[in-house]
């Protein structure tokens, strides 16, 4: 299994051209093993819609239901272990709580994280597909 950063999940569902060919290959490759989506990504999507930073073709609740039903997608709960890990990441990591939780989720599950976020890509304490 790999863990998807929120924007990767949204781009994949929307067929967004910002996904690189390598990222598309990884999504196909790991589909049978699991594409983990942190529960916090659902909140992130809802907040992006609320702030008009993301437009969806249907109500956000419907979109989430459909996007979570995509082949290989596994919703990963925000467990107490992940919550604590997100506050104790090694070395200084940026302050976005959602990114902290997504990184902690990947670390807790011992899975690679797929992202295009420069701040996460420069963080050496998480396994990344890049």
Where are these regions (language model features)?
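Residue-level signal for well-ordered alpha-helical positions
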Residues: 15-16, 48-51, 70, 89, ...
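Short, well-structured N-terminal submotif of metal-dependent ribonuclease cores
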Residues: 1-37, 51-66, 109, 123
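Histidine- and aromatic-rich ligand-binding microenvironments
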Residues: 5, 38, 94-96, 117-118
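Acidic, PIN/NYN-like endoribonuclease modules and their adjacent C-terminal/linker elements
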Residues: 1, 103-130
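Alpha-helix capping/helix-boundary segments
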Residues: 8, 41-42, 82, 102, ...
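Active-site neighborhoods of divalent-metal-dependent phosphate/nucleic-acid chemistry enzymes
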Residues: 57-58, 70-116
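Phosphate/NTP-binding elements of NTP-utilizing enzymes
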Residues: 45
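General small-molecule cofactor/ligand-binding pocket signal
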Residues: 36, 76, 129
């Amino acid at each position: 299994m790999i863990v998807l950063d929120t924007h990767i999940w949204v781009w994949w569902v929307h067929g967004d051209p910002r996904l690189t060919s390598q990222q598309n290959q990884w999504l196909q490759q790991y589909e049978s093993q699991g594409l983990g989506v942190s529960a916090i990504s659902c909140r992130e999507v809802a907040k992006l819609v609320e702030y008009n930073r993301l437009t969806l073709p249907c109500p956000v609740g419907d979109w989430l239901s459909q996007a979570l039903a995509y082949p290989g997608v596994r919703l990963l709960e925000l467990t107490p272990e992940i919550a604590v890990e997100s506050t104790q990441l090694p070395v200084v990591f940026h302050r976005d709580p959602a990114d902290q939780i997504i990184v902690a989720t990947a670390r807790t599950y011992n899975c690679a994280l797929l992202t295009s976020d420069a701040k996460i890509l420069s963080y050496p304490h998480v396994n990344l597909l890049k």
